[in-house]
Amino acid sequence: MDLLQSIRRLMKREAAPRARPEKSLPQVELQTVQTPTAPKTFLFPAPNLYSRILVEGRTVGFVDYGLNPLGDRIYIHKIEVAPEYQRHGYGLAALALIAAQYPVPMTPVHIYGSALDFWSVAREHLQRLGRQITDQLRASQLEEEAKRWQHLVPEPEHERLIREYWVWVESERAAGRPAGPGIK
């Protein structure tokens, strides 16, 4: 391979596939808390999930994630393992547990540079388990993605009342009766 091909390969970030020895994941436990999401946030009306990653009763990290309201995808907002516990497979083991609990594609939300290697390994491992990690979702793409379940978002009562009022005004006007603002 000549120098130009090597440079192109690096520019495209097409690293040669590395052979990784198959090793079992460490035993971890997830302690999960479910919290409601606020209206007009990404996963609303589905709850947000926050899991502590435990190893022999010690907290080694956490995962912040959520299942979308359609139930067809898990979004991983953040996975963090304390520095002294990194590179032991705890984060990967936590993702494997989440993937087993929710057999739907998993989507990382905005992968930071330092996590690219982790997600590459996670993608390979979960694919071997028959699970899929989709391309990351950037912050600028969240609103567009959330449109897929907007039909499930309950309409606030004040907005419903305003909408119904204007429907009534239009029906009254169509019937030739005065209605709406400014009627005396």
Place the predicted regions along the sequence by residue:
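Terminal substrate-recognition subdomain of acyl/acetyltransferases
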Residues: 2-27, 35-69, 73, 104-184
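Conserved acetyl-CoA-binding loop-helix of GNAT-fold acetyltransferases
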Residues: 81, 87-100
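Conserved acetyl-CoA binding element of GNAT-fold acetyltransferases
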Residues: 72-83
